[in-house]
């Protein structure tokens, strides 16, 4: 569909293009019904996923792309889907998505891996704006997002995401679906936002606690919490949390309980 455009992927932008519409159709299908939703795509690249989204007739699709070389491709798509497609030439990290789309909103994207985690953390700050996310991550990052306690992948991303959403891994993909082929495997996950957070907690306080404890994840929780409070032993005792546990052993609720005591 874009054979006339010879675009060499830029390594500094983490560009890995998906050429197969069979793959992008499958990813978009994982997002479920999109006909009544505003859809946001990050890093549309050559437009393969863009076409897959537009074929499912969303209320509107807005794509954010940093690489100006891709403008001719997307100008063509804009003309083909008049009124349905908007293209924004910008860095997604600089945009508050609340300013460009009207709810209900779903995000569907093959994220640039170099900024994928930063984007997710940014969106969590206003996650109630979204209905859901269907996102391609590096498999290692996806495994961290969906991890449960007592798992080596469990950490900050797991807790902050799952406080606000149900998370599901939909499919793993090998490097062969991309051009150029990355050195890592990839995964598509669905993040479905809950009507309310699982637990009542001050998010900024929770984030600080989680960040400090998981930065020293091999240390016992009683040791790392002393960087935040002088009442570590009393707090853990009042919550019936053994003080010899490591952060990966604590549930999201236990972290929220600790935050509410500090």
From Swiss-Prot:
PROSITE patterns: RRNA_A_DIMETH (PS01131), SAM_RNA_A_N6_MT (PS51689). InterPro entries: KsgA/Erm, rRNA_Ade_diMease-like_C, rRNA_Ade_Mease_Trfase_CS, rRNA_Ade_methylase_Trfase_N, rRNA_adenine_dimethylase, SAM-dependent_MTases_sf. It is an enzyme of class 2 (transferase). S-adenosyl-L-methionine binds at residues 18, 43, 65, 91, 110. GO terms for cellular component: cytoplasm. One of its GO terms (molecular function) is 16S rRNA (adenine(1518)-N(6)/adenine(1519)-N(6))-dimethyltransferase activity. Its EC number is 2.1.1.182. The lineage of its organism: Bacteria, Pseudomonadati, Pseudomonadota, Alphaproteobacteria, Rickettsiales. The gene is rsmA. Belongs to the class I-like SAM-binding methyltransferase superfamily. rRNA adenine N(6)-methyltransferase family. RsmA subfamily. It comes from the Bacteria. This is Ribosomal RNA small subunit methyltransferase A. Specifically dimethylates two adjacent adenosines (A1518 and A1519) in the loop of a conserved hairpin near the 3'-end of 16S rRNA in the 30S particle. May play a critical role in biogenesis of 30S subunits.
């Amino acid at each position: 569909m874009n054979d006339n455009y010879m675009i060499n992927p830029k390594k500094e932008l983490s560009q890995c293009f998906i050429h197969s519409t069979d793959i992008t159709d499958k990813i978009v299908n994982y997002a479920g019904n999109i006909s009544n939703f505003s859809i946001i795509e990050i890093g549309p690249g050559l437009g393969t996923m863009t076409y897959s989204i537009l074929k499912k007739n969303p209320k509107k699709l807005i794509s954010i792309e940093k690489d100006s070389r891709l403008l001719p491709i997307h100008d063509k798509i804009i003309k083909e889907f008049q009124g349905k497609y908007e293209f924004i030439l910008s860095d997604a990290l600089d945009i508050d998505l609340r300013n460009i789309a009207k709810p209900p909103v779903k995000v569907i994207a093959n994220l640039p891996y170099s900024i994928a985690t930063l984007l997710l953390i940014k969106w969590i700050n206003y996650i109630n704006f979204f209905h859901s996310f269907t996102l391609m991550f590096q498999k290692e990052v996806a495994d961290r997002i969906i991890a449960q306690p007592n798992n080596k992948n469990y950490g900050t991303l797991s807790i902050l995401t799952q406080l606000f959403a149900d998370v599901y891994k939909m499919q793993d993909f090998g490097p062969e679906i991309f051009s150029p082929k990355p050195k890592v495997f990839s995964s598509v996950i669905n993040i479905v936002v809950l009507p309310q957070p699982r637990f009542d907690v001050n998010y900024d306080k929770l984030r600080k606690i989680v960040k400090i404890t998981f930065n020293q994840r091999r240390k016992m929780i009683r040791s790392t919490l002393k960087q935040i409070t002088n009442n570590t032993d009393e707090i853990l005792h009042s919550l019936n949390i053994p003080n010899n546990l490591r952060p990966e052993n604590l549930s999201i609720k236990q972290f929220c309980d600790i935050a509410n005591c500090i």
